[in-house]
Amino acid sequence: MKVIGLTGGTGSGKSIVSAYLKKKGAYIIDADQIAHDIIKRGMPAYEEITQYFGGVILDENRNILRKKLGSIVFANKQKRDFLNHCTHKYIIEEIDRQIQQEIQTQKHLCIVLDAPLLIEANLQNRCDEIWVVFAKEEVRARRVMQRDNITYQDAKNRIGSQKNWQTYQQYADFILDNSKDL
C-alpha cells in the first residue's frame, strides 16, 4: 500500500488537502492530532514536558495549555528542540503502529501521513512519495493568525521555526501551490 507523506509549512493548507484525500478514500494519519494526544495527562510525554517547563504551562486542572506552550517554544529554539526530542519518539511510535495496522487491514486506497515536521522528524523514509503543500509566507501568516487566534509575531515565529521552502522542495515528488484563498 502506498504511503504518501504530506507536508509543508504551517498555514500552507495541508489539512485541506488531507480532508480532500480522505474523501477520495485515503487513510489519514494526522501527526498533529497524535502530538495533541500524547501530551495529555497520563501520557508519557506529559510527565517529561511538565517536569521541564513547570507549572507555567498548566491550567488549574493540570492540563497542558498548548497555546502557552507554543508561545514559549516557538520563541526559543532550545526549548523547542527539547519539546521535539521528548515528543517525536512517541509520535513516531504511533505513526508506525497506524501504518502497520492499515497495511494489514487494507481498507483504504492509500495512506496519507499528514505531518508538518515530516522532514525534521526524518519520516520521509516511511513514505513512497512526498507531497509538499506550498503557500506564500504572508498568506500562511494570515491563516495561522486566524486559525490559532494569535498575533502576527507569534505566527511569524511559528513559520520561522520550520524548514525553509527550498528544503521542502528538495524532498518533494509533488508540489501543490495553495497560495490563493479557497
Regions found by a protein language model. Name each.
Residues 15:
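Walker A/P-loop
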Residues 12:
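ATP-binding Walker
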Residues 36-109:
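ATP-dependent small-molecule kinase phosphotransfer cores
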Residues 9, 21:
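P-loop (Walker A) phosphate-binding loop of NTP-binding proteins
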Residues 97-110, 124-133, 137-153, 164-182:
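NTP-dependent small-molecule kinase module
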Residues 4-6:
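Hydrophobic anchor at the beta1->P-loop junction of P-loop NTPases
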Residues 26-40:
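Short beta-strand-centered segment that lines the nucleotide-binding/catalytic pocket of NTP-utilizing
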